[in-house]
Amino acid sequence: MRTIKRDIAGAVLFSNNKHVLIGKNVKGGVYEDLWVIPGGGIDEGESKEEAAKREILEEVGIDISDAKIEPIELIQTGTTEKTLRDTGERVLVDMTFYNFKVTIDLPAKNIPIRLEDDFGHAEWVPIHKLAEKAYSPSVENLFRSLGLI
């Protein structure tokens, strides 16, 4: 199986009433059976923050231009399998994750989710219920480092 490298920008989205946005990728996607945060590949010439903003808009339809955005110091790596959309080829993906903490000054119920791109499901989860879900290894580690689970 062929291996590809990808730098990934993602975000932990917080509402002002202590909910976090998590989702699951569509079938064949990265970590398809586990909960993840919105994010995706950083395009050439794009900053990590620009990529995170674009991916959030593409995956869940939320514009975070006016939100508080802070880089998370923890940089992680991970490897998983993925089916390439254009060719159907199954590949191994070596990823480096660069994440941001994004705080939106609205309650979760007032932040609509519009699923597009890679996300097949997404929901706002109260922080105290995050420990009930099964996450990708990188998201689990990230949530633990932030004291969320």
Please report, for each region that a protein language model flagged, where it lies by residue:
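Conserved N-terminal beta-strand and adjoining loop/helix that marks the start
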Residues: 1-20, 38, 98-101
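A conserved beta-turn-beta hairpin within the catalytic core of GNAT-like acetyltransferases
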Residues: 29-33
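Unchanged
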Residues: 42-138
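Short glycine-centered helix-capping/turn motifs at secondary-structure transition points
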Residues: 146-147
